[in-house]
Amino acid sequence: MSSAASFRTENDLLGALDVPAQAYYGIQTLRAVNNFRLSGVPISHYPKLVVGLAMVKQAAADANRELGHLSEAKHAAISEACARLIRGDFHEEFVVDMIQGGAGTSTNMNANEVIANIALEAMGHQKGEYQYLHPNDDVNMAQSTNDAYPTAIRLGLLLGHDTLLASLDSLIQAFAAKGKEFDHVLKMGRTQLQDAVPMTLGQEFRAFATTMGEDLARLKTLAPELLTEVNLGGTAIGTGINADPRYQALAVQRLALISGQPVVPAADLIEATSDMGAFVLFSGMLKRTAVKLSKICNDLRLLSSGPRTGINEINLPARQPGSSIMPGKVNPVIPEAVNQVAFQVIGNDLALTMAAEGGQLQLNVMEPLIAFKIFDSIRLLQRAMDMLREHCIVGITANEARCRELVEHSIGLVTALNPYIGYKNATRIARIALESGRGVLELVREEGLLDEASLADILRPENMIAPRLVPLKG
């Protein structure tokens, strides 16, 4: 192919540009690529967003055909193009950076141009021959970026958050399995990094499962609550200018059928076009999940610390050598990585919050950052949870002897004896044990405060890790 044949010339408001001949995107996409060299993350990085865009364009084409505004031939070609995008074809043509000026216009035009050029080829024409089928007049008919783009974002989140839920559920099951496995392992609970009272390692891991289970339940209901109300049909600011009066209801109905999602028209299109509250709340829930996940990873790192000079109650699977200077050192790299993912998700939430606050009047031009951060948080969390489960949780083992040793030598054990020997005796025993370094049980035996049978009964794990009725004294 000659140099001249390697490009096609397209024109827009600002003049002419040479677009790569093989590209399915067009001049407006090319301008955006040249303008926004920012994150290095293109739209194609998030396939469900591309699918959401294609579904919106398909729904719009269906409605416009039914209303008599789009010819059968154009509708058929656009439908073929959208179907291919929904199947996963041509996603590499979505090249615009996720961070962009223009409230998402570059993303919308990237979709319009790619769909138009795929459709043109299906009609037997060349890419760029927009006199036969136009990105704006036909693919974008009765739409504005301001309703098509946020609708596609919502749809992409609805379509994609199931993978996050599946990863979270699998992690919860892994925690629960470890809870069952470690149910018999007695250890010391700790508050404020100090010895507290006995518990089992199983209880600790079941608590991890429970707290993450709360988030799973909330995330399952939150997306349908927040993201199914769409402003498609509102066009520029929510008034529906340039759309058939019958278009909005029909387009949203078609979108629900195409996507399989229970989307409904927004009650107030002007409010829905400018307000980003749903994204703020959904991102806040992702942040909550990240915070909980990070706290669990902090605990795993502490419980496995040592191995000789730390707590060392559990062993994390060794994943790689830990030091270039200290031979034999193995670090808890998986929980450390998850901590960092959590920090990123928390940062994403703050950036999204500021973007939501930064809108003015009838539109929020910061929607591209909102989309980027919320899709990024979902992707990071999903991958982090899979990594944590596969490379850490399922391989954790308990150091049972170490756990029992710490219980037997802990001052905190005196709390379990308090109802039987009295607070005064318990306080004195604790002080002597602390000052002398001797064990609580050793001192109780030495002073004859309890016989061996009573001690054995009190110290049975099931009697120390749950409420127990203590007989009243005389």
Model regions: which residues?
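Conserved, well-structured ligand/cofactor-binding cores
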Residues: 1-474
